Amino acid sequence: MNMEAFILGCGGMMPLPYRHLTSVLLRRDGDLFLFDGGEGTQVSLRRLNLKWKKISAIFISHTHADHITGLPGILMLSSQVDRTEPIYIYGPPKIKEYIETSRRVLDMYINYPIIVKEIEAPCVVHTGKDYIVRAFPLDHTKTCVGYTLEEMDRPGEFNPEKARELKVPVGPLWAQLQNGSEVKNEDGQTVKPEQVLGKKRSGRKFSFVTDTLFKPSIIDEVRGSDLLVCEGMFEEALIDQAKEKKHMTAKQAATIAKEADVRRMTMIHYSPRYTDKELHVLLEEAQSIWPNTELSHDRMHIEIPYID
């Protein structure tokens, strides 16, 4: 099952000619999840040829303009692609008012259900057959949350030799065992999945953190992430400015990644004071703490593979 992230916009505060505002799309086995929807989100979706008809849920960190101004257009255009499935929108207080006001003022034609749920973190906000999305509190100038999407454990590796020893014929019964179902062998005896499967294997974890002061509690929330998308807005020399605006420096983001033992971190939400040529300052500072750090850029594609 594939899991991959697309950085639709990596900028903070204001768009630049080469940098849209914050938005990340996560694709998991055909399902699409959008995290924030800043200005320019539609442009990246189109340029990447991603079918936003498949977006089933949108997760909003907070209601500052650089994280939500792309939403109305996404919702309107979804009506132009024959969408009938509902779309769920999760976010802190005011997100429902923003969506409803946008629909009314813009006289939006919507031909599918929009279900908006305001949340109080920490909590599980969205569940699927084999994953959960959890929200947790951040510390910004207004109510702000981070998110993790975490898969449940997978069955252990299938042992074909053991299946043969237990007289389970090759074919559909093997697949049933791998999917967790008991079967009958050639002698009519019951064979359980645990008899032919190894130790359970962990699923994958994706975390999204932006617009916050450094908080030790974030470390526990994102611990073990296969991919952490995290703001690194300022260099360390501007830490006082970061604190005043309730943002993090690149070093603080890297500290979270290191302490949480994440496999990979990509930074987003750069201050517009940095041109692309100047972003190396943020990268160098972050990598001095956590080498598995990289800079994101608009329309960047990141595979999130299983460890085993």
Give, region by region, the residue ranges found by the protein language model.
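Conserved beta-strand hairpin/beta-sheet module of binuclear metal-dependent hydrolase folds
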Residues: 1-48, 84-86, 147-149, 156, ...
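General small-molecule cofactor/ligand-binding pocket signal
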Residues: 6, 90, 115-120, 134-136, ...
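Active-site-proximal loop/helix segment associated with metal-binding centers of metalloenzymes
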Residues: 16, 131-208, 212-221, 227-229
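Active-site neighborhood of phospho(di)ester-bond hydrolases with catalytic His/Asp-centered motifs
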Residues: 35-38, 55-63, 91-92, 207-212, ...
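Active-site metal-binding motif and surrounding structural segment of the metallo-beta-lactamase
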Residues: 39-90, 118-120
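Metal-dependent catalytic neighborhoods of phosphoester/phosphodiester hydrolases
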Residues: 70-77, 102, 275-285
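Active-site neighborhood of divalent metal-dependent phosphoester bond hydrolases
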Residues: 83-118, 273
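Binuclear metal-ion centers of metallo-dependent hydrolases, dominated by the metallo-beta-lactamase
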Residues: 122, 214-308
